[in-house]
Swiss-Prot record:
MF terms in GO: 4 iron, 4 sulfur cluster binding; 7,8-didemethyl-8-hydroxy-5-deazariboflavin synthase activity; iron ion binding; oxidoreductase activity, acting on X-H and Y-H to form an X-Y bond; transferase activity, transferring alkyl or aryl (other than methyl) groups
Cofactor(s) annotated in UniProt: [4Fe-4S] cluster
Cross-referenced Pfam families: CofH_C, Radical_SAM
The protein's name in its UniProt record: Cyclic dehypoxanthine futalosine synthase
Classification of source organism: Bacteria, Bacillati, Bacillota, Bacilli, Bacillales
Amino acid sequence: MSIDGILERAVNGERLSMEDAVKLYESDEVEKMGAAANQIMLKWHPEPITTFVIGRNVNYTNFCDTYCRFCAFYRAPGHKEGYVLDDEVILKKIQETIDVGGTEILMQGGTNPDLTIDYYTDLLRNIKERFPNIWMHSFSPAEVWKIAEVSSMSVEEVLRELHEAGLDSMPGGGAEILTEETRLRVSRLKITWEQWINAMKATKKVGMHGTATMVIGFGESFEERALHLQRVRDAQDETECFTAFISWLFQPENTGMYKTKKLTPRDYLKNVAISRLFLDNIPNFQSSWVTMGPEVGKLSLQYGCNDFGSTMIEENVVSAAGTTHKVNTNKILQLIREAGKIPAQRTTSYEIIRTFEDKEAAEKDFVMQN
């Protein structure tokens, strides 16, 4: 069945249904979807600019009592290989990030049952006292629900205290697939899809924004993928809590799901395009070169992405599953230019800091650590 009618409706600004999304997932006309998604991206972003942010992942703890089957990073509470980083180690990592022009810290960890709200607020105040201008784009719904549980607080109360202590925005990690079927199969102890949605809505209530994410490749159905997109779109309609959408593929190596069939870059590009076509209320789509590699990341700029994501001075979670791609600032500039775009460094809230003209390079750069 031709998908031309669905694509035409999307490009003309008509909202797609879940049934439309399923038909797109069933089709192999990926290039057509990419072209339509690119047209929609250009309506949001008519200038030939692709943005990126200079940031670092800081994984402050790997202790986690959620035991997701797909995670190679966590260690059970009490495990000899588990850790909680000292504040001074975290502060040193932030200083190194600022030294190369970084503006964002994506600080995330496991759901550590030994860390109460006081640990997080003390850490954030310590960071902001030393580095008042760094943007803390940190934690996740699962971590916030764990803090609420061990601190006998509501999620909204936790987010309000974190925000007052220095949290600026919250990434939408841990969404994976927002359906009960897949979550029960791959992360039985993790927060429910409703809890994830409610935490992201609560970020807006306390004066912050967040991002929405999606991970495919757990063996979920096309209907589940469409339902995930529907739930994200509904939450955005209600609260406008998301500044961006990021999707990637599950990396099965070194995990409890290592026998799962690995999806292809083509599957990733199709998902990016369908998401852009469906999510008509989210302005920014980030490439996921960290999992997909820089060349596929570059291709995604033709499939609906307007942003290359973060430089990732450090990354530990994806690399624990056997996937390591190292890209510094000047490599990102090169990749964006190869895609026919003008690179521009941005803040976490998508304000442009600097546009790199012609062959202009970053004066300060780094070697990715992990």
